[in-house]
Regions:
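Catalytic loop of short-chain dehydrogenase/reductase
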Residues: 21, 117, 149-175, 180-189
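Conserved mid-core segment of classical short-chain dehydrogenase/reductases
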Residues: 99-121, 164-168, 206-208, 261
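The beta1-alpha1 cofactor-binding region of Rossmann-like NAD(H)/NADP(H)-dependent oxidoreductases
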Residues: 66-78, 117, 227-228
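A short, exposed helix-loop element centered on a Lys and neighboring polar residues
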Residues: 135-136, 181
Length: 262
């Protein structure tokens, strides 16, 4: 039996960036479903329907949706679709966005002199704009019901630490934490909490050899699993987290506080 402080039965959640089988988004969707929530999983490609089918096959109440959340109209449409399907929307996990690859010149990687304006804007759109658009669309629904949970999946890169040649990614992820804090203050009186989670090195299917090596240098001598990050996300969405808002929970195995590296 799920304790009342964790019980999400009767709640409906939207998790973006849930297309990867090994990613944080899919793990977060599964964690919320395990606590009783009905979940809409969203991604940019049709593989999200495979993720939805897998969760449904495990006995959870899930639907999949495809959306390009760099477009505000698409974000609004996604929220409307989730609301229309479940007749409510209580939880949003903003996980959509490109992950850091730790290599100059790849994706949004690059320092301020090598990164062009187009790449900068693309990184902001993928990571920060998408979170803003989805949150903005969901907030009126949550305000009307008097209950809501929004979680930004940021990163230690930007809000907590810095990495070479990751200026756009770091700025976008730091912006997500700033957005969470601002929304937390603006909507606390409406029963809505807004928090961020900042993962460190995570063992996902997209983890590079360099990232894997860095994970071995953390105090815990390993990268985190997606499920370990999802546990923090899920807790922030529960009734028990009702008085926690505007916070950034770091999930990095102590890496950001260690003065020494073995």
């Amino acid at each position: 039996m799920i304790p009342a402080s964790l019980d999400l039965a009767g709640r409906a959640a939207l998790v973006t960036g849930a297309g990867s089988e090994s990613g944080i988004g899919f793990a977060a969707a599964r964690a919320l479903a395990e606590l009783g929530a009905s979940v809409t999983v969203a991604a940019t490609t049709d593989r999200v329907h495979e993720r939805a089918a897998a969760l449904a096959g495990a006995g959870y109440t899930v639907q999949g949706a495809i959306a390009d959340l760099t477009d505000d109209g698409a974000a609004e449409g996604l929220v409307r679709a989730a609301l229309g399907h479940w007749d409510r929307l209580d939880i949003v996990v903003n996980n959509a966005g490109m992950t850091s690859v730790s290599l100059p010149g790849a994706a949004e990687g690059g320092d301020a002199l090598s990164l062009d304006a187009e790449a900068w804007r693309a990184s902001m759109a993928r990571n920060l704009d998408s979170a803003y658009y989805v949150s903005r669309a969901a907030l009126p629904v949550m305000r009307e019901s008097g209950w809501g949970r929004i979680v930004m999946v940021a990163s230690v890169t930007g809000p907590v630490m810095a990495m070479r040649a990751e200026s756009a990614y770091a700025a976008a992820k730091a912006g997500m934490v700033g957005l969470a804090r601002s929304l937390a203050v603006d909507f606390a009186a409406d029963g809505i909490t807004v928090n961020a989670v900042a993962p460190g090195w995570i063992a996902t299917g997209s983890q590079t050899d360099h990232e894997r090596e860095q994970g071995l240098r953390t105090p815990m001598r390993r990268s985190a699993t997606a499920d370990e990050v999802a546990s923090a996300i899920a807790w922030l969405c529960t009734p028990g987290a009702a008085y926690t808002t505007g916070q950034c929970i770091v999930v990095d195995g102590g890496n950001s506080i260690a003065e020494e590296r073995a």
